[in-house]
């Protein structure tokens, strides 16, 4: 358990690479409208395999050897990470993956904030907060990115 919550306490949507697609947006809209969810956490994790697959595809194109479904995941992650390859991080594969994981989490959180009229309205007028965070597979610690409200 990451947040020490019981079954039914959290509305959880799991998807490789924490990508944002219409089904995930619809699920979040449902949770926010139906159940009053006011905190959405885009939780990625260190050494994410989907992000790694995207980096590998960008560095060494496979020419379509991935399935159409896996390619759809890679294609959704690509815009968040491709700019890092021209950065200094590209010379250090471990650092590149770390930065790419965080960039992908941020991009997914931003997509949710600005990719749904329903969520935009809930953010503007009803206190919905969308934040990114990274779970460390090594330590079990969740590192929340900026924008998390202080506890009351």
Where are the language model's segments positioned?
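Short helix-loop-beta junction
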Residues: 2-15
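Divalent-metal-activated hydrolytic enzyme cores
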Residues: 8, 17-38, 49-152
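Conserved functional hotspot residues or short segments at active or partner-binding sites
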Residues: 42
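Short, charge-patterned binding micro-sites
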Residues: 46
């Amino acid at each position: 358990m990451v947040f020490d919550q019981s079954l039914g306490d959290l509305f959880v949507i799991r998807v490789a690479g924490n990508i944002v697609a219409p089904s995930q947006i619809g699920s979040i809209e449902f949770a926010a409208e139906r159940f009053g969810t006011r905190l959405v956490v885009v939780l990625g994790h260190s050494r994410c395999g989907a992000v790694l697959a995207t980096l590998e595809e960008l560095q060494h194109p496979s020419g379509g050897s991935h399935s159409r479904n896996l390619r759809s995941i890679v294609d959704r992650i690509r815009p968040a990470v491709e700019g890092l390859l021209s950065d200094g991080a590209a010379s250090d594969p471990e650092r590149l993956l770390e930065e790419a994981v965080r960039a992908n989490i941020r991009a997914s959180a931003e997509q949710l904030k600005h990719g749904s009229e329903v969520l935009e309205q809930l953010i503007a007028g009803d206190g919905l907060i969308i934040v990114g965070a990274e779970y460390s597979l090594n330590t079990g610690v969740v590192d929340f990115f900026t924008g998390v409200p202080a506890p009351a």
